[in-house]
Curated annotation (Swiss-Prot):
Organism: Parvibaculum lavamentivorans (strain DS-1 / DSM 13023 / NCIMB 13966)
Source lineage: Bacteria, Pseudomonadati, Pseudomonadota, Alphaproteobacteria, Hyphomicrobiales
Gene Ontology CC terms, in alphabetical order: cytoplasm
One Pfam family here: Elong-fact-P_C
Protein name, UniProt field: Elongation factor P
Localisation: Cytoplasm
Segment forming the signal sequence: none
Length: 187
């Protein structure tokens, strides 16, 4: 679908220079002289490169709609992560390297959303929060709770986060998967 340069919004995916790019930041500029334009920060969906472009209002770009499909995480085998489509029971494999650091937060049976274009996976969305157990953290020192200091903790998936001093080894906490930060104790 073709759209004008001034209609680009953050989150839109456009076809540009032979690739698919996501608009990260968009700033509309109307200078005193000349026509209005949109200053757009783009991120390549395949290799992650960033690019700044100007699109004039009269210029048209091809907006791409990504297919979003829900999958269930099954298991990992030799660096390949296996997901199952809940409707067709079809399985797909994505490399752990392609999923990136967020692969550490995958849990058996977790529902994820895979974004694809023309059958090629471009992105994966995990739930915003997961519950994990702390396997190792320093003990609380009496009197240390007066200040708002944080201490490092190792989670069951091998990821390190900073937690408040009252959190102890063996507790289950809620972690933000986007920022990789402690949110609260799990219920």
């Amino acid at each position: 679908m073709k759209i004008n340069g001034n209609e680009i919004r953050p989150g839109n995916v456009i076809e540009h220079e032979g690739g698919l790019w996501a608009a990260v930041k968009v700033q509309h500029v109307k200078p005193g002289k000349g026509g209005a334009f949109a200053q757009v920060e783009l991120k390549n969906l395949v290799d992650g490169r960033k690019l700044n472009e100007r699109f004039r209002s009269a210029e048209t770009v091809e907006r791409v709609r990504l297919e979003q499909k829900d999958y269930q995480y099954l298991y990992e085998n030799d660096g390949m992560l296996t997901f199952m489509d809940n409707e067709t029971y079809e399985q797909i494999e994505l490399s752990r390297e392609w999923v990136g650091d967020r692969a550490a937060f995958l849990q058996d049976g977790m529902k994820v959303t895979v974004e694809s274009h023309e059958g090629k996976a471009l992105g994966i969305s995990l739930p915003d929060q997961v519950v994990l157990e702390i396997t190792e953290t320093e003990p609380t020192v009496k009197g240390q709770t007066a200040t708002s200091s944080y201490k490092p903790a190792l989670l069951e998936n091998g990821v390190r986060v900073m937690v408040p001093p009252f959190i102890t080894t063996g507790e289950r906490i809620v972690v933000d998967t986007n920022e990789v930060t402690y949110l609260r104790r799990a219920d």
